[in-house]
Design a protein with these regions (language model features):
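Alpha-helical bundle segments that constitute or directly flank the non-heme di-iron/ferroxidase center
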Residues: 1-28, 51, 55-58, 62, ...
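Small-residue-biased structural context
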Residues: 2-4, 11, 24-25, 83-89, ...
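Acidic/histidine-rich alpha-helical segments that form the ligand environment
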Residues: 10-22, 80-119, 135, 140
Length: 159
């Protein structure tokens, strides 16, 4: 429903604040903790969130501005292991802060023209699946929450 989507957009809008509440408590020695053996470190998760949500923003722009376009896939594990994954988390957090402000405003504007915007799609070339703007909103609202829970779990498990 439109009400559910509005709530998901609010989740996207407020995600950086929720993330800040958690990462502001992290000690320097905890940034390399992981929620499971072989999983990404907290630092990698924060960088992944910036990478992933930048891609989501671009995908949102493609859906809104183009007809019949494709998602540009990327290897999230390769990105999470790239050189910038060792950089300080602050840069990625600042990206998320600005990005989510702009992204949520774009999504809120899209909801005003819901009948036309929410049904527009992108094609995912690997699966052939059509992904709508509604799908993206739902996916990325839960994506942030999912990784926030991983960070919390890593911190709890380390104590």
């Amino acid at each position: 429903s439109l009400g559910e989507l509005f709530n998901h957009v609010l989740e996207i809008q407020h995600f950086p604040t929720e993330l800040a509440k958690v990462i502001s408590t992290i000690q320097e020695s905890q940034w390399d903790l992981s929620y499971r053996d072989g999983g990404w470190s907290i630092k990698q998760i924060v960088h992944h969130l910036a990478d992933s949500h930048m891609n989501a923003y671009v995908r949102t722009k493609h859906i809104i501005t183009q007809d019949q376009t494709q998602i540009q896939p990327y290897d999230e594990n390769a990105w999470a292991s790239s050189l910038d994954a060792d950089f300080h988390h602050e840069a990625s957090y600042l990206i998320l802060l600005g990005l989510h402000q702009k992204w949520s405003l774009l999504l809120l504007e899209s909801l005003k023209d819901a009948a036309n915007q929410l049904v527009k799609t992108l094609e995912h070339p690997e699966s052939g699946r059509q992904v709508s703007l509604s799908d993206l909103i739902r996916l990325y609202a839960s994506h942030g929450t999912h990784h926030l829970e991983q960070i919390k779990y890593a911190l709890i498990a380390s104590n």
